[in-house]
């Protein structure tokens, strides 16, 4: 067999083995299966005629949430810890504030009451199971618009992770309040001890 014929046969064989592009997943995550994850990125909040921005890191370990906010929006640095029963805020001076004081501090710093319990689920691109909700085009996944607790959450971009679509960019609005979230990095673990 000549060299030219050999190259032709090899080219045809490799062409038949080419891998077709894989479409991104079109399903939203099941919150019960996504209990352990971290997300970090940027956020901007406008409320009461004022606005601010900052960076954030969100860690979810089962029912426990740890949200760290840095930059002007957090007035330096602020960490929010929730477990479904209590809320604790650690401010830039290292002071730990219990539920009532923590809620007042968040309202003062952010200019509004953010639905943090629901936001845990909105971060995943799904409604919170704790209150009624409506989903636009429910038959289409991933979810593009959620309406819940007086808020409208619109999703613009998604990233593939563990076979599902996770939000990269979304905006939550209620009246004159507008929260924009951009996730730069997702890390998802299947069980405790496996990361993230």
For the regions a protein language model found, what residue spans apply to each?
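Sec-dependent bacterial lipoprotein signal peptides
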Residues: 1-17
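Bacterial Sec signal peptide processing site at the extreme N-terminus
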Residues: 13-34
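Post-signal-peptide N-terminal segment of Sec-exported extracytoplasmic proteins
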Residues: 33-73, 77
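Glycine-centered tight beta-turn/hairpin loop motif at sheet-sheet or coil-to-beta transitions
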Residues: 49-51, 73, 92-94, 148-150, ...
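Extended lipid/amphipathic-ligand handling interfaces
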Residues: 56-59, 80-82, 155-160
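An acidic-aromatic
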Residues: 64-115
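Flexible, processing/modification-adjacent segments and terminal tails
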Residues: 93-149
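Gly/Pro-enriched, hydrophobic low-complexity segments
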Residues: 125-196
